[in-house]
Amino acid sequence: MVSVLDKINVTELRPGNMLLQQPPFLFVDRILEFDEETITCSKYLSHNEPFFSGHFPTQPIMPGVLIIEFAAQASLLLTMLQLNELEPLMGYLVKTENFTFHALAEPGTELEAKVKMLKKMGNYYTTQVTVRRSDNKKKVAKGQLVFYLDEEGKER
């Protein structure tokens, strides 16, 4: 059986067409790499991101919860591609495990999230995510995410 993914270059896919989240809550700009077990996605942090004006005005940094959201969106994209699904699916983040933060994510930085699928149990998926700065590869955050994917509740 030939999959949809055999006919396209995944780096040309537009995350905004695959995810239900939309700006200003869409945090994946591009898919950089994909194979059967991993995906790498990027997010450029422009100086006019809405959250920078309040977190923190004198030293703006991306809030940790939004770094986790970026990781969750990248995890959902990996799962969708593994399922050969390009139409938006509803995913629910149900647990974060051992998420640690190591460096600041400041305006002008591009982040890369490398996601590896660890396990699938029914409609529950566990991923390992490492978020790095693309310029110096410094680790920004690392942890595991567990989410529920409602494959029956596809958005059409």
Swiss-Prot record:
The active site is at H55. Signal peptide: none annotated. Gene3D superfamilies: Hotdog Thioesterase. Keywords: Lyase. SUPFAM superfamilies: Thioesterase/thiol ester dehydrase-isomerase. Its EC number is 4.2.1.-. GO terms for molecular function: lyase activity. InterPro entries: FabA_FabZ (IPR013114), HotDog_dom_sf (IPR029069). It comes from the Bacteria. Belongs to the thioester dehydratase family. FabZ subfamily. PANTHER family: 3-HYDROXYACYL-[ACYL-CARRIER-PROTEIN] DEHYDRATASE. This is Uncharacterized thioester dehydrase BH1850. It comes from Halalkalibacterium halodurans (strain ATCC BAA-125 / DSM 18197 / FERM 7344 / JCM 9153 / C-125) (Bacillus halodurans). The lineage of its organism: Bacteria, Bacillati, Bacillota, Bacilli, Bacillales.
